[in-house]
Amino acid sequence: MKSDIDKIFESFDDNRIFKDKSILQSNYIPEEIPHREEQIKQVASILAPILRGERTSNLFLYGKTGTGKTLSIMYMKDELLKRVKKEGDFKLKIEYLNCKMKKVSDTEYRILAELIKKLGGEVPNTGLPTETVYTKFIELIDREKQFIVLILDEIDQTVKKISNDFLYNLTRLNSELSKTKLCIVGISNDLTFLDGLDPRVRSSLSEEEIVFPPYNALQLQEILSKRSLEAFKESVVQEGVIT
């Protein structure tokens, strides 16, 4: 048995396939994101006031699955955190939540509880009035001068399951905060998502919108080729495989 295990570990150490397998992971963020330069510039211009600790518009990113929405905003997350750490005189927290995850997708309470946990607080998964959870959320984030960005992926799925009120309540939080500034970044595959919102909710958003168009065939080929060159050792991926 030991010799078999040794062979497995030795084979892994002597991997002849990958230079860096992590490059193929869904959460990998490259140093450059090809064919999304314009969208990233737009995101940067909208969120740039954060660097001075100033309130910024809420932001909604739209596009079909696989168009680089989440990748682009996570890239911008790293850029903002890096700059604030170097130059800022306030704290910046950026938290990502996929609202389609089963453990949070069906109630406003569960989403708030998960956000509280991500921001370092504690709340039971069930058992409290939702209004109480909102109060705990406000108390948690308003303890000190800071800027918080909440990235809510698949936000349209949550609004459909819960109601417009969830989004309305989130966008109204800034009026109850004295020290902290809050920005919502929503990500949706549904380009008509905002059109279906209650006018009261839509007016409370004060949002900017960016649409991510689908990649064309040549762009996809370039992206895959670049990623494969970084991930695999030479000659592993034969010419013509990515076409």
Features from the language model and the residues they span:
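A short, basic N-terminal segment
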Residues: M1-S57, E79-K82
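Post-Walker A helix-loop "phosphate-sensing" segment adjacent to the P-loop in P-loop NTPases
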Residues: D78-F90, E122-V123
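Glycine/charge-rich, flexible interdomain linkers and switch-proximal surface loops
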Residues: F60, K64-T65, I94-Y96, K100
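Short coil/turn segments at secondary-structure boundaries
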Residues: P34, G63-G68, K102-K103
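Short, charge-rich binding segments
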Residues: I50-E54, K64, K82-G88, E139-D142, ...
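Conserved short-loop catalytic and cofactor-binding motifs
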Residues: E31, C99, E208
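Walker A/P-loop nucleotide-binding motif
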Residues: E54-E79
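Mid-core helix/loop region of P-loop NTP-binding domains shared across ATPases and GTPases
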Residues: K2-D6, F12-R16, Q25, T56, ...
